[in-house]
Amino acid sequence: MRTPRSLRSTPAWFSRAGWLVVLALVALAVGAFFVLRRPSVHSTATLVVPPPRGLAIGLDEENANLLGTTGAAAFAPWRERLGAVEPSFVRLDVVWSKLQPSADAPPDWGAQQSGCLRDLPPCAPYDGLRGQLRALAEQQRAHPGRFVGYVDLFGAPPWATVPRHGCVPPGVGPTALALSDAGLAAYRRFVSGVLSLARSEGADLRYWSAWNEPNQPAFISPQRARCATDAQALSPASYAALVRELQGALAAAPGDHRLVLGETAAYDTPRPTALSTVEFVDGLPHDVVCASDIWAQHAYVGTEGIGPVASLAGDPGRAGSATLLADLERVLERRGCPTPKRIWITETGVGGPKPGGPRPTDPAALRGQCRALNAALTAWYRDPRVDTAFQYTFRQDDSYPVGLVDTGLTRAFPTYDLVRAWSTRGFSTDGPPPVPGSCR
């Protein structure tokens, strides 16, 4: 994010070099970066001050009873705990197929949700996406400048997709199939509807991702023309079409809305049914890969590799996925976009030795998980290209157990204390916080 500021005329004794030093120090102090323009009677000079290194914290949570400042009484203590994290960003997963299952009816923005987590209590109903946006707006009013909305779209309604073709793994459902031409037009209308709904509820949805994990067959299929690593990659073109439709919808809407590219699953090498992150970036058209200066990458924390078969996370499993991120940074540079990419880690978390696998919850294991996540956050803080890390999720999803509090809302894990400590630093450029006592 760059904010232009006009500079007043400077005294003759104050050199341009002096301005550069002062401005760089100011940028480092406030944890921001700016595009600075100095007016002249002859010309306009533009100075870009690079962003300082640092790390902001985002959070993924869908339950409006937890996300807002009001809601069901049973959720109140945990709602307060989420609010105390004060994340810079909140990531909302918007599942198109659930909101508009039929082409003959408009999206049901208020479709009642149980508030359970995959049928597990505690439960309390809320009004679907409308309720989520209302809750987000409450937090944005209570915490100005924080809880900024980031939308991640996925889940194609079967009526909007192409027939099965190419390499589609047997377990992949119809909501993962690529969109047809008519489906792409409907997708743009759907995005426009979400934008309109957010305006009516007063929620700031600043950042937008066209599709979740587009290099993963459970979200876009086919990934390849046939199930072999040397087969033609198809998913980059499917994703590019989505990005262009999203660009059109955002450009037509009032307000400040920004595109985020990627949301890629952390596949470090090509697989027969999935593209590696590097392979996916290489396959994108130039206009798409250069359409934003932010690339979103998933990187969970674990201790074991995942083997040769594509799974939901796909992570190499090492803290911070340092090798994968280095490869990502190199391929993004190689694509030659005018503006260097910033990297957002839009899904992370820690649980078992294998990301997404069974999570030990004995005290020693939980402390070890906390220290492992802290190592990843510290590595990303030190990486000058990484700006943000999003915890997935607040309330633990038992199908992917890396949350900050348990599914039944009876206990907070040590990682809650850690994420809160990172998030509540004065500025994202402040150094890593002390490791909480619960993690030691």
Model-derived regions: residue spans:
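Boundary/entry segment of secreted carbohydrate-active catalytic domains
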Residues: 38-95
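N-terminal Sec-pathway targeting helices
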Residues: 7-25
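Hydrophobic alpha-helical membrane-insertion segments, chiefly the h-region
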Residues: 25-36
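Structural preference for beta-strand elements that scaffold enzyme active sites
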Residues: 54-58, 89-91, 146-150, 205-209, ...
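Short, acidic/polar
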Residues: 67-83, 187-197, 273-285, 370-379
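Aromatic-rich peripheral "rim/lid" segments of glycoside hydrolase catalytic domains that contact
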Residues: 110-112, 200, 214, 219, ...
